[in-house]
Amino acid sequence: MTIEEQAGLVKLASPKLAGTTGELRDQALLAVAKALMDNKDAIFDVNKQDMEQAEKDGIAAPVLKRLKFDEGKLRDVINGIHDLVQMPDPLFQTKLARELDEGLTLYRETCPIGVIGVIFEARPDALVQISALCIKSGNCVILKGGSEATKSNKILFDTIYAAVREAGLPENCMLQLEARSEINELLTCQSSVDLLIPRGSNAFVQYIMSHTNIPVMGHADGICHIYVDKDADIGKAIPIILDAKTQYVSACNTVETLLVHKDIAKELVPKLAQVLKEKHVELRGTKEIQALVDCVPATEKDDDTEYLDYILSAKIVESVDEAIDHINRHGSHHTDSIVTENKETALHFMRMVDSAGVYQNCSTRFADGYRYGFGAEVGISTSKLHARGPVGLEGLLSYKYKLFGDGHIVDDYAQGRKKFHFVDLP
């Protein structure tokens, strides 16, 4: 069976899944959580095989960190599933109720997008999170994970699919692609797939966007910035920078570039450099930074690089506006933070920086669906259409209009025999 034919079966399952009750979908999620726990030893063994092969292949350390699926990550994904179960059913929610005329009533109601194709990096925990979000939101899903995690993804998918089927969700509500070559086939399935969410490098995401007619939602690079203003509290700034750089270095919301106001640089940079050195972070600085501390010289390329590694580039700026201009020019519109005690400066920064997330006095690592209280996320979108920032349940929903009448016809209004009165209902 071709990928197009398999995707067609998923499309046929879409209205069946959309019509299920929230109670049934929650039961399916609980079944998934139980199945993952029951099969954890086998899952860990298979993941160990992927890890060993990746190490033999010389895979970079950040990728290895994402690839690992251990007790901690299992606990996190199961907690995320339980959080989703506690959330109200996102479907069939009335967002607008309006009486257009007597006996003619309009409702806008939430519904699933339909079939979502997600192409993601070698992160087994992402497969679980994405699957759970799609189950909760009533969306069928087609999954393609990174090749380094092939065995881990297969056992996780098989475990999840068996659990949801046993719980009563429709056949073909989920599909897993395993071969890299199948990605290009998926890109041609515009009659079956309603939305693609690619996660990966900038080059990969751009490739997906330019080779499909399916709508694409997502982000490419995660070039996040922290700007330390002249009115910053250094006691806050250093822990924030350290957390944003080292808490999970291979994440897309990790800070890559530090901008420091000239008036605070002499006090901040030497202290920060010492702490970064202790954490084995390589500091790359401009000439002005090099004049304050011993560090690796930065190049223009560093302004546009997502390291996903223990590297931080740093630059001194004259003003908050120079910082804003730098971020808007070199950033990826993902997440950027200002450290300052000046409320007006912070608000100016947050208004002018064109990113999905703009923060004051906190780490960029908060850009995450779970930390936003979304339960989990399917990815982070830097698009300004439909969904922006961490994409949780709400970002996986569309809506439909339901109009209830009693023999109403448009010609009565066109000829003036009747008039609309447009009354919003509670």
Regions found by a protein language model. Name each.
Residues 18-19, 230, 316, 339:
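A structural signal for short, well-ordered beta-strand elements
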Residues 86, 95-231, 235:
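Rossmann-like NAD(P) dinucleotide-binding subdomain of oxidoreductase/dehydrogenase enzymes
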Residues 41, 180-207, 250-358, 415-426:
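Aldehyde/semialdehyde dehydrogenase
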Residues 27, 325-426:
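C-terminal core of ALDH-fold dehydrogenases
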Residues 1-106, 133:
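N-terminal Rossmann-like NAD(P)+-binding subdomain of aldehyde/semialdehyde dehydrogenases
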Residues 20-26, 91, 167-174, 247-254, ...:
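Flexible, glycine/charged-enriched surface loops at secondary-structure junctions
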